[in-house]
């Protein structure tokens, strides 16, 4: 029986990748390597992280930073790809300036129902700073101890895609003294601003692809389901067995989904943005 290959867009897409919390631009390396060579990809550190000199801030200000990054790279319109917290940034940007966003791809994105008691505790005016500092000091230490035990038990080094959450936290505090403040600022924004991002979802005009693992332990799968219902033009795909960190644990699946999604959305050969 003949099979039909998914449509592939031949347009020169510009894609801006937004990492999660904590995270960095390097989280996207495995994904961008697998994308068509003629696509223009930008993966930069968000405010408060890595090489970005801007202080940590909320969703709206992060969105303005996205537009600044686009301007710096000569990109007029782009496809925004956001993971976790970065998904909230992508939604904020798409609702603020629909004319600059051609499509949105959300990987295990924050959204309705994702804020829990721990999030609210970390964002509280009195206890928040102390809890954030203690958590930032203790969690990496615990993670490194766990990673050492796992390495010993397996009698080999861990691969990049193994125990990703432990690996991310195990390296989170090394050489980045300001990160606990970034963590605190973003927790406060998550609690204070997420409802505003959700309220503006109806303003998102671009087509949206949502990717998530039903067994995600960090952002409930129900959050992705609610986003799919709220967004005017959304398509949901499951990525089973990858957990929360899809860019690292399932880069091939993510890249293939991106290519297929943009192929369906843009079948003409006219140039895109930029």
Which residue ranges define each predicted feature?
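Flexible "cap/lid" loop of the alpha/beta hydrolase fold
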Residues: 95, 104-136
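Short beta-strand/loop motif that positions the catalytic acidic residue
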Residues: 204, 210-212
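Active-site loop/oxyanion-hole signature of alpha/beta-hydrolase fold enzymes
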Residues: 43-85, 256
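Conserved HGGG/HGGXW glycine-rich cap/lid loop of the alpha/beta-hydrolase fold
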Residues: 6-51
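Catalytic histidine-centered segment of alpha/beta-hydrolase-like enzymes
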Residues: 242-251, 255
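Conserved alpha/beta-hydrolase catalytic His-Asp/Glu region
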Residues: 106, 115-117, 139-203
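Acidic catalytic loop of the alpha/beta-hydrolase fold
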Residues: 191, 214-219
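Conserved alpha/beta-hydrolase "nucleophile elbow" surrounding the catalytic nucleophile
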Residues: 19-21, 78, 82-84, 213
């Amino acid at each position: 029986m003949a099979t039909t290959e998914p449509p592939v867009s031949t347009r020169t897409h510009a894609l801006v990748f937004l990492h999660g919390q904590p995270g960095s631009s390097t989280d996207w390396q495995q994904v961008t390597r697998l994308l068509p060579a003629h696509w223009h990809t930008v993966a930069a550190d968000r405010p408060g992280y890595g090489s970005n000199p801007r202080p940590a801030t909320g969703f709206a200000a992060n969105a303005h930073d996205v537009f600044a990054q686009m301007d710096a790279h000569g990109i007029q319109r782009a496809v925004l790809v956001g993971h976790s917290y970065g998904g909230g940034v992508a939604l904020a940007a798409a609702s603020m300036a629909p004319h600059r966003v051609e499509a949105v791809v959300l990987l295990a994105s924050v959204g309705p129902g994702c804020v829990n008691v721990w999030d609210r505790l970390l964002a509280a005016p009195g206890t928040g700073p102390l809890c954030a500092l203690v958590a930032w000091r203790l969690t990496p230490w615990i993670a490194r101890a766990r990673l050492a035990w796992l390495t010993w038990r397996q009698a080999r080094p861990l691969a990049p895609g193994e125990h990703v959450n432990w690996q991310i936290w195990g390296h989170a505090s090394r050489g980045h003294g300001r990160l606990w403040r970034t963590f605190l600022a973003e927790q406060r924004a998550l609690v204070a601003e997420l409802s505003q991002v959700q309220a503006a979802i109806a303003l998102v005009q671009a087509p949206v692809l949502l990717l998530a693992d039903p067994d995600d332990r960090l952002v409930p799968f129900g959050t992705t389901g609610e986003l799919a219902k709220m967004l005017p033009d959304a398509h949901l795909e499951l990525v089973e067995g990858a957990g929360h960190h899809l860019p690292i644990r399932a880069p091939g699946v993510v890249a293939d989904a991106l290519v297929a999604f943009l192929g369906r959305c843009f079948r003409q050969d006219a140039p895109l943005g930029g």
